[in-house]
């Protein structure tokens, strides 16, 4: 019997190759991608790249997601394969094979499939490893080179991950055999799905959960809380999608059946009857396609937007080659650090900016009346932030004189309410808005709050000392900024950056013992070299992961579509043969098939685009935290991604639909 199960295992894989080809291809690609992610995460050469810590963090996170996604896709593909082999397994049981023999046969099939796919997957991963490493270097802006990235631990990690996945396959298939008798096995592949219960309640629940998920996505305004709300919204939308496909589609089909003028037409009757016959299974497949498609769209839109917007963020976050920023310190401290740096590094200055300003968060707003957080509320995250500059500083930055008098201010604001106001009240002090200003600090002074809040304002006052006195006792912070552009910013950039950090730390040690009556003094130094390296590492790594996660999700989408079309083709073939025998001609068969395929085609796509539309606001807030500050750029990226995905989706469905029509027409 041992030899018999060996021969059967091998012959079954050959006979069922049409079912196993997509399964094997998907598994090989999943293994290859997991191998590449593992190899890159362990690659010692990453330490030589700018932003190495950010790259490793993102790759490590991506490895976990890839491993989980691979497991889900392999399990899903296995369920389709086993469903279509139910009749075959039942026949073996009727012919005398016991369940332990069937289990032994399936175990050997899984071992053969696992060995072959692991061998090929690791081979493909190793083959493209160097090329992918060069691709990662190119994305993060480094010179490409085919550096060997093989790590000893890569193969054991991949083997452990997929050994767990294939072990789970064996357990799932074994449990399937244990709970079904031979008669059930022979009929399992042919039986229709049971009509669900409480369909109307499920439909209403689906609408409610999806609606609340959409509400969460649209109502969040704070980028930090958006990340938390995003996961809750995703879970609600996924649940709502499955409920609506499972129950909502059935309810709609039942309503169409009751509409006699529509239902009692040959094409409509056959299509609707086929969908109703197996709606539960059909609904799960369609919902899965919709969710996977949404994942592809959201991942690509987010990653591509972050990558496309990095130049804008760099210009905003690092307007100068070298900067020193101090909070609650005298301007002489920041000047001293920068002067010592320029003296010791020998850099020649092209442009130098020295600015002192205040910033504070708004606790309450009633039209144009604003209240600042009190001194003991500094740790509260504000919804709106003000940066305050003196009239002299404004002239220094722009070359223009506002000629403000007492109680007059100039204002640039992102606050929608304040844009229409002629005056503003801050902690009970009224000011007339003399002039509405443009963003006068862009490219000159970094605003650290642009990635945290979308509601920020720049206020220009005639006298800074008088203004500070009017808001005494509030959670206000004074910031001093010194930035320089040098003649040759690339010359010894790393060495210069380290020198600036060293001088800043030295000055901080001298300031540590000072008492100012406000939160302790702080000095930070930055170089465009460091900021750009960290940004390229994080953004490039994010795009890299986004691309490969999209491949994984698209792979899952293609698999579900393919197996769904194939399994439904075999199920529908016998019914179409019967219909042809009772008078349905070939043209009507093709028309009916086309109608059914188009219905199945559009539903997941409509849901996916709808999910993306409602998630767009939340995605924009999340990528804002990472530095995407241009909403128009994100919109263009989204349109391009949707267009490319639509074409890919149409191509996949066109190819799989041909298989469906060919099976049905046999």
Language model features with spans:
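Short cytosolic juxtamembrane segments of multi-pass membrane proteins
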Residues: 3-7, 179-193, 570-574, 661-666
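N-terminal Sec/SRP start-transfer signal
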Residues: 1-31, 195-200, 209, 244-293, ...
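Basic-flanked hydrophobic alpha-helices used for secretion and membrane insertion
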Residues: 313-314, 320-325, 331-555
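Short helix-loop junctions at transmembrane helix boundaries
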Residues: 39-53, 122-155, 211-228, 603-666
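Hydrophobic alpha-helical segments
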Residues: 112-256
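Alpha-helical transmembrane segments and their immediate juxtamembrane interface regions
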Residues: 154, 231, 235-254, 311-337, ...
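Hydrophobic alpha-helical transmembrane segments of multi-pass inner-membrane transport and secretion
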Residues: 18-45, 53-90, 110-124, 202-208, ...
